[in-house]
A protein has these predicted regions:
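N-terminal accessory targeting/assembly segments
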Residues: 1-115, 119
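C-terminal-of-GTPase-core extension/linker across diverse P-loop GTPases
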Residues: 1-20, 40, 146-218, 224-225, ...
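Switch I (effector-binding) loop of TRAFAC-class P-loop GTPase G-domains
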Residues: 2-4, 202-205, 227-256, 270-275, ...
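Switch II of P-loop NTPase G domains
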Residues: 2-7, 33-37, 60-77, 243-244, ...
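Conserved catalytic network of the ASCE P-loop NTPase/AAA+ motor domain
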Residues: 11-12, 79-81, 248-252, 257, ...
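Conserved Switch II/interswitch segment of TRAFAC-class P-loop GTPases
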Residues: 25-26, 62, 92-95, 284-305, ...
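Switch/connector loops and helix/strand junctions flanking conserved nucleotide-binding motifs
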Residues: 27-30, 62-65, 95-100, 120-124, ...
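Short alpha-helix plus adjacent loop in nuclease-associated cores
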Residues: 116-136
């Protein structure tokens, strides 16, 4: 699928980029900053250094050049004076926008990339299994097909790097007919893989299935390690997990399957959702969802909305769900105000101090139970905080689902409090 080898033996220098975003009136400056910070995190994940960020207040991106002529001139002036390899935009660019922007930066030989291409590049870098590699390659070609501009047609002359981690590095002729044939081939290959995956899932149908879902980089893989007590790759990078990981776990004597799935993100490319159908089937066909949320992130509620919307989009929005607020050890309680004194403990000398972990969990539970219909648990998977409460909630749901499948499998008296064992430190 992807040839990641450099075209020469010398070590390549770190690539540099400037980031560009538009900010509609409904979007606060803080939101704009957070969105650009997320884009910068994507860029960092690919080993690229962000040199500068440009924003423009526009209700909608300019149909020709994404930003207005004045802002475009400002960016051109900057990249002409600074060592910049690429200009990256925080939205999908249309084929005509790509052509116009490439023309605007042609004299500087600067690559023009958008958010979807960055995400596809990260997925290409992370994919390990044949299924994931095929899914990513299909998504890449589907993205490439309407965008056969200078970026793609001259790939054989490029040195590779971010945005070039695709078929061009194999010196394939980027011709519409060839790409269309390749898309057809990959779809057929993926259909075969999907049928094999479906057969494997049917063989596992006798077990309750639990899927970890959530925004990218919220700690799903760390939580998987805690629950499964197994080695699962976890890293503080976006999309550290692309391939689904399945582990057999037991609660009491009831086994269930726990799946760590790919994280969601704002503006997830449609081609990825389509290509990752089989991977997302692990979520669609799960009996129970663990929706993991990084409560320490300032935009965690927006991230929850992104995940909820994506789950609804793939047909998994109505499943029994436990909302797992993770990273409570990093959570910063609201700044104290007169109306906010519940967030602090009052001492005898009327001074205040930050809430203890137990008190903080109590306040958070009170707040979110009033707003969410699902089970809500507050944990730190990294620090092993409050994991027993999560196991109890999850165990109850697994038992209920299991007995729906096998109502006479165990005597009623099998379960008692002694079956709940705390994880050893």
């Amino acid at each position: 699928m992807i040839d990641k080898r450099a075209t020469n033996s010398t070590e390549k220098k770190q690539e540099t980029a400037v980031l560009v975003a538009v900010s509609p009136q409904r979007q606060s400056p803080q939101q704009t900053k957070e969105y650009l910070d997320e884009l910068a995190f994507l860029v960092t994940t690919l080993g690229v250094e962000t040199r500068h960020m440009f924003t423009q207040n526009l209700e909608h991106p300019d149909s020709k050049t994404y930003v207005g002529s004045g802002k475009l001139q400002e960016i051109q002036t900057y990249v002409a004076a600074e060592p910049v390899d690429m200009v990256i935009f925080d939205d999908d660019l249309s084929p005509s926008q790509v052509r116009n922007l490439e023309a605007a930066f042609e004299s500087e030989e600067i690559k023009v990339l958008d958010r979807s291409l960055l995400i596809l590049d990260i997925f290409a870098m992370r994919a390990k299994t044949a299924q994931a590699k095929t899914q990513v390659e299909l998504a890449q070609y589907q993205y490439m097909y309407p965008r056969l501009t200078r970026m793609w047609t001259h790939l054989t002359k490029q040195k590779g790097g971010v945005g070039m981690r695709g078929p061009g590095e194999k010196e394939l002729e980027t011709d519409r007919r060839i790409i269309k044939d390749r898309i057809t081939f990959l779809k057929e290959k993926l259909d075969k893989i999907d049928r094999q995956s479906m057969t494997r899932r049917k063989e596992r149908d006798r077990l309750v299935r639990v899927a970890l879902v959530g925004y990218t980089n919220v700690g799903k893989s760390t939580l998987m390690r805690r629950l499964a007590k197994a080695d699962v790759f976890a890293e503080n990078k976006l999309f550290a997990t692309v391939d689904s990981t399945v582990r057999k776990v037991s609660v009491g004597n009831i086994p269930y399957l726990l799946t760590d799935t790919v994280g969601f993100i704002r503006k997830l490319p449609t081609t990825l959702i389509e290509s990752f159908k089989s991977t997302l089937d692990e979520v669609r066909e799960a009996d129970i969802l663990l929706h993991v949320v990084d409560i320490s992130h300032p935009s965690f509620e927006e991230h929850m909305d992104v995940v909820t919307s994506t789950l609804a989009e793939i047909g998994a929005g109505d499943k029994p769900t436990i909302i797992v607020f993770n990273k409570i050890d990093l959570y910063q309680s609201p700044v104290e105000t007169e109306a906010d004194e519940d967030w602090h403990e009052v001492t005898d000398d009327t001074a205040t101090k930050p809430l203890s972990m137990e008190a903080l969990i109590g306040q958070l539970r009170k707040s979110f139970h009033a707003r969410k219909a699902d089970h809500v648990v507050f944990i730190s998977a990294e620090q092993n905080e409050n994991m027993d409460e999560l196991r109890q909630h999850l165990g109850a749901l697994v038992r209920d689902k299991h007995f729906m499948i096998y109502p006479n499998w165990l005597d009623v008296g099998y379960y008692d409090e002694g079956d709940w064992q705390k994880e050893e430190e």
